[in-house]
Amino acid sequence: MNSLATQFKELPDPDKRSVHLILCEHALSKWREYCATQRRIDYVETVCGTHQVVDTELPADALHSAREGCDIKNVAKRYQEPIAAIQDDNLTFPDPIEFAYYALYNLFHKYAAQEIVDDWLIVNQALSSEEDESQRRTQLETAIQRAT
């Protein structure tokens, strides 16, 4: 994957953005597959002891906001509680799903909130949403080809 990483890092910014969007579409599909298997995703936030229900549409809204280049549907505010809960271990997902969630979160911050986020971090997280490690290289190759 090293030569692919180098290939990605040498892309112009608009092509990197395209790769990010392509890979995060896949991450979103993994998120949606997971959500479809859950009746409801909820947790207890330990600071105040409140019961929270996960907003399963938030990652899709994050992707949409990233595409548009601005925060649509108050995504930044909606992410505050679940990200804190993940960091506090109040909310847990299987590793690939957590990677998908973070990939979409970081994509949002880079392209909608215009924050500095490492380009490779988004790629790595989005690829890690794929449980089948043998597919990751092909995913990145395909995304780079489609973007250029």
Regions found by a protein language model. Give the residues of each.
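Structured binding/interaction patches within domain cores
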Residues: 1-148
